[in-house]
Amino acid sequence: NIYYSNSLNLLNNKNDISKLKGFILDSAVKGLLIKQNINKENAEDQIKAIVLESEKLRVQKNIKKVKKNILPYNFIAPFRIPSNWGWVTLDQICYQITDGVHHTPIYTSKGIPFLSVKDLTNGEINFSNTRYVSEETYNDLKKRCNPEKYDLLLTKIGTTGIPKVIDIDKKFSLFVSVALLKIPYNKVNPYFLELVISSPFVKEQSKAGTQGVG
């Protein structure tokens, strides 16, 4: 198998685990690691269902509608994907893309955890050294940015573009250094999306588009 051979070469010749990980992630997002079920619903129908569900959730949660970036009509795919897959933008599948509060809130000695980029380490959400805000402040902040289970967090400062699925059912607020992506997780697998965003292909796009935050 060419992919198995290439992965061994990366490991044996360069001893570079990060490059091996990148190779595996790229293979996964190209649909090369598992046999595809061509009898599944076609990509166009799947995308329509995702977009409809995303809009339904946006309305239900009373989230402000914003103009979405979609693929241009002359879009050229950078690589081949399985025939039952399709290309989309994050805007198309997310019903909200936002970030944490842009001002420093009043901290409390205990209360609701208030996370910043420093609390996302080694692929985990670390609550051991967080600041806290009051329940009242939390209720105010969540009107604009309300992290919930199966949403995705995305770092905006330092090493940008590192995603993390919220895999716990816990209340917390976010600072501006972390972005929040809300998806219809009954239609989009959040863990696959996390892998896609972690892939070298998407990281290159993120790097090219990073101009600063605030």
Language model features with spans:
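Short coil/turn segments at secondary-structure boundaries
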Residues: 5, 35-41, 63-73, 103-110, ...
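Non-catalytic DNA-recognition/assembly elements of restriction-modification systems
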Residues: 1-7, 11-14, 19-27, 32-33, ...
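A short beta-sheet element
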Residues: 116-117, 135-198
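Cys/His-rich finger/ribbon microdomains and the adjacent scaffold used
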Residues: 42, 46-89
